[in-house]
């Protein structure tokens, strides 16, 4: 993973986990995590991630990522490595090219999808546990769309 990509993933993770109102606060959080960056670099990263400052009802502003930005960024780069997504009432199974499952599972985990409780990856298969009952089919369809893969029994993805 490139330094730029890693830094952007950390920035996205920080923005999802904390209420950060200024680039200086974000730079301090990055430095605390051992990542050095300039304000100009951080500004470009925020623009690339689609982050924007929004007003809070209780006053002040915070940086916020658009819905789905992280998942599209991280998962879209893995298109072509997934051969099929299937589900039953309680589990989603993703079949990948040999050796690809760990990277795809990590991208799913980092995407912070609210419908995903967690993942377990082998060499070419990922088990995805939905966060709630009756969400497996919906989650399978969403992951298949993000990964450019067919859902079992529905034909190729568009």
Curated annotation (Swiss-Prot):
Pfam families: Arg_repressor, Arg_repressor_C
InterPro entries associated with the record: Arg_repress, Arg_repress_C, Arg_repress_C_sf, Arg_repress_DNA-bd, WH-like_DNA-bd_sf, WH_DNA-bd_sf
Pathway linked to the protein: Amino-acid biosynthesis; L-arginine biosynthesis [regulation]
Broad class of where this protein is predominantly found: cytoplasm
Organism, as annotated: Anaeromyxobacter sp. (strain Fw109-5)
Record localization: Cytoplasm
GO biological process: L-arginine biosynthetic process; protein complex oligomerization; regulation of arginine biosynthetic process
GO CC term (a single one): cytoplasm
PANTHER family to which the protein is assigned, alphabetical: ARGININE REPRESSOR
Alphabetized UniProt keyword annotations: Amino-acid biosynthesis, Arginine biosynthesis, Cytoplasm, DNA-binding, Repressor, Transcription, Transcription regulation
GO molecular function terms attached to this record: arginine binding; DNA binding; DNA-binding transcription factor activity
Entry keyword Zinc: no
The protein's name: Arginine repressor
